[in-house]
């Protein structure tokens, strides 16, 4: 058996629809497009969401909410990821050098997910209750 001898199982692939090949085919002349109108023309289609000039649903519904500017510069770091940071003191700069957060992040919160085995000092980061308990149980401490 070679790659050039492989073929699909008989009957598994339907034959292509050959349009414009006479009346007997069932798809002759207008090729299944009907008569006249925008959708019968080549390239004739309306964009998704267009409702024929009626005000589209997307514009009929009210706007709501906003994106907080602070959320764009805030990140969460899991407890398990702190093990990747070299050194005993963990702050914003060390998280950036360890590639755990991007350079535009200004606020970080440490959340309880995973576990930490070594002693670390978390400096200037917000920490959840569960993460704080886990860090202190491992012999670490939190500094504001």
Curated annotation (Swiss-Prot):
InterPro entries hit by this protein: Ribosomal_uL15 (IPR030878), Ribosomal_uL15/eL18 (IPR021131), Ribosomal_uL15/eL18_sf (IPR036227), Ribosomal_uL15_bac-type (IPR005749), Ribosomal_uL15_CS (IPR001196)
Superkingdom assignment: Bacteria
Biased composition (Gly residues): 21-31
Gene3D superfamilies attached to this UniProt entry: 3.100.10.10
Annotated family: Belongs to the universal ribosomal protein uL15 family.
Region (Disordered) location: 1-57
Alphabetical UniProt keywords: Ribonucleoprotein, Ribosomal protein, RNA-binding, rRNA-binding
GO biological process, one term: translation
Pfam families: Ribosomal_L27A (PF00828)
The species this protein was found in: Photobacterium profundum (strain SS9)
The keyword Nucleotidyltransferase appears for this protein: no
An example molecular function term from Gene Ontology annotations: rRNA binding
Full protein name: Large ribosomal subunit protein uL15
Keyword Repressor assigned: no
